Amino acid sequence: EKKPKLKRGRPKKGETREAIKPTILSKQKEMQTTKEMLSLVSTECGVGIKQNSKGNREVWIGGKLHISAVDGDIPITAIYSSASVHDSSVALPLIQETSKKVNYLYDLQDAGYDADIIREFSQKHGHRPIIDINPKNSQALRDKIQLAEDEKKKFEYFNLPQSSDIHHYNQRSMVERVNKYLKEDFGCNTIYYQGATKVASVLAFGILCICINQSLKMVT
């Protein structure tokens, strides 16, 4: 559904505008089941844009896989969506599904998940959310982030103990490793099938292989 273009600024006298529609997150907050939450998430082919670790924009067409992983680089939950879907739109279903499968303590997420609804949902499930701050064009928040970075460097320089949150947040890299395994070791870097069901099936087999492979490593 295409959104009508609106003129910038305040509406003219007598001009009426549609009320702001509730976000996907605010709708999901009121839902009980994962199936209901995912009914709001598109799986159609779309265009995705993200910023890589070097600060460059990457653009791709298709979909993306949202993964929840635990220690040992073991994927627990994976949800496929359109490439254009914002990561935060799948946060609540990921937390809910993963909580059904395993007991865990921390929800570690980057700045793309910085939302009060996600924090509250995580706490409701008995977890501690550790989510990076998204400055959202706020100079005050940027200053706060910079101050935290400066303090972190000082603590490292003097070899002083830091907040355990920093240690836990750094463990978020296990999801990146799962993505790496999926692309480099299990043939999911480029998928030429058409249709969300076929693509999601290929990715699901890849996730299953990683889960078995990493679990065997822990046993042996």
Regions found by a protein language model. Give the residues of each.
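Polybasic low-complexity intrinsically disordered regions
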Residues: 1-124
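Short, solvent-exposed polar/charged micro-motifs at secondary-structure junctions
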Residues: 1-2, 117, 140-142, 201-204
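Helix-centered, glycine/charged polyanion-binding patches within enzymatic domains
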Residues: 111-184
